[in-house]
Amino acid sequence: MAELRSNMITQGIDRAPHRSLLRAAGVKEEDFGKPFIAVCNSYIDIVPGHVHLQEFGKIVKEAIREAGGVPFEFNTIGVDDGIAMGHIGMRYSLPSREIIADSVETVVSAHWFDGMVCIPNCDKITPGMLMAAMRINIPTIFVSGGPMAAGRTSDGRKISLSSVFEGVGAYQAGKINENELQELEQFGCPTCGSCSGMFTANSMNCLSEALGLALPGNGTILATSPERKEFVRKSAAQLMETIRKDIKPRDIVTVKAIDNAFALDMALGGSTNTVLHTLALANEAGVEYSLERINEVAERVPHLAKLAPASDVFIEDLHEAGGVSAALNELSKKEGALHLDALTVTGKTLGETIAGHEVKDYDVIHPLDQPFTEKGGLAVLFGNLAPDGAIIKTGGVQNGITRHEGPAVVFDSQDEALDGIINRKVKEGDVVIIRYEGPKGGPGMPEMLAPTSQIVGMGLGPKVALITDGRFSGASRGLSIGHVSPEAAEGGPLAFVENGDHIIVDIEKRILDVQVPEEEWEKRKANWKGFEPKVKTGYLARYSKLVTSANTGGIMKI
């Protein structure tokens, strides 16, 4: 074991004042000289994925003490993307990731901890803590709060939060009545935990396993299961071993590890937000990773599992089928799909970790020779509409559609788009453009779950494409193309599109183009008046000035 970092505040005559303060915080004489462990929690009452994390913090601290460490718990902020959806609150969601990363870095660096247990769960909390872990680079393990159980209607049909969002669109289209919508509302979110489909939170918690920063089960053991509490205890104890072996996050998160994370993402059809967050993680880890490389991973990794919102299979079903380790083990049977020699938090390789984890239900995790598609569930599109890339969740596209052409229907905000969709300004075959909703323009790159849910609920899901410099909830599905870079607020091509322009989306060829004569296009660019920030004060104003486009992970300029 390396020399303890905490010696900086515990050892020597000149540290008597520091020890005096530590004694006041409950540190005993025999604790000096033991590893000081940061327990980075994200308990918060208003987020259902986090209401139970206070109990998990207690379990972690008990396990740390039993294993010979001294735990110190602190908390981060958190935003519930579902509750923040559809109003100004969503502008704060992605920016909260940076606050979380900064706050964790601040607390841990200021107090010279020797190791860290991160207890995240929902959308921006996990990536924020991951980013901080890369910056601090002390032995760290991730322990998510676990997924919510799927809801069930009175007829036994499994549902989730996305069912409720889509139910609103269905009700407004006259497809269901008020009682049916009320039933979806009552039963869509039956327990604590991260929402029950392969949405952003669960995607990131599963990717933490593939990255090697969490033990098997992190992404799939239900929040309310006794197995989850035992998992929390086991993970905390593992951290003490990781400290003894002096394994740090940057030893684990390499190009190979990020390839593995995206390979899992492709196999499970994870949220498009994983691209944004993993690119930000790579940046903090000092790893160069391009969007083109993501397409290379997609070319060699098949799509093996289709989960909600793309199907009626939920995270609980994935767990029963063997979880992430089983999916990775199945994937490992294809040569070159994974880097099996990648290091994990236990000191074992990924190959050693997943060995023997066989698939228990091939209806949930398809066998390698019977994939949903030969290519992975995410794709990066390029073209004159997205010179620096755009992301689509191919695993969420219905009916195997790979190409769409149609006229643009342009909206300058999500609110404007929602109004237009509800008032039938969008029809079959159209390409909806929602711009000025990127990291700078939004500000905060809000999720477009409400517009996509309206489109699906009104029966237009497979018949309309939606393109935005904003992003999508993991609960979104359909021909939803986000993260268009550079964004409109930066003078990206999306700013110059007009109603009726012919748009081409070709998933197979990875193309996103607009067909406008060059002379006309240059005229539009010359006439563009620039972007006026929507928010002039507070954190969002600072964020808007400092943030970069989605192709960099939406990170802040230094």
UniProtKB/Swiss-Prot annotation:
Comment on bound cofactor: Binds 1 [2Fe-2S] cluster per subunit. This cluster acts as a Lewis acid cofactor.
Positions with a binding annotation for Mg(2+): 81, 123-124, 447
Catalytic activity: (2R)-2,3-dihydroxy-3-methylbutanoate = 3-methyl-2-oxobutanoate + H2O; (2R,3R)-2,3-dihydroxy-3-methylpentanoate = (S)-3-methyl-2-oxopentanoate + H2O
Enzyme type, top EC level: lyase
Subunit structure: Homodimer.
Function: Functions in the biosynthesis of branched-chain amino acids. Catalyzes the dehydration of (2R,3R)-2,3-dihydroxy-3-methylpentanoate (2,3-dihydroxy-3-methylvalerate) into 2-oxo-3-methylpentanoate (2-oxo-3-methylvalerate) and of (2R)-2,3-dihydroxy-3-methylbutanoate (2,3-dihydroxyisovalerate) into 2-oxo-3-methylbutanoate (2-oxoisovalerate), the penultimate precursor to L-isoleucine and L-valine, respectively.
Protein name: Dihydroxy-acid dehydratase
Organism of this sequence: Bacillus subtilis (strain 168)
Gene, per the UniProt record: ilvD
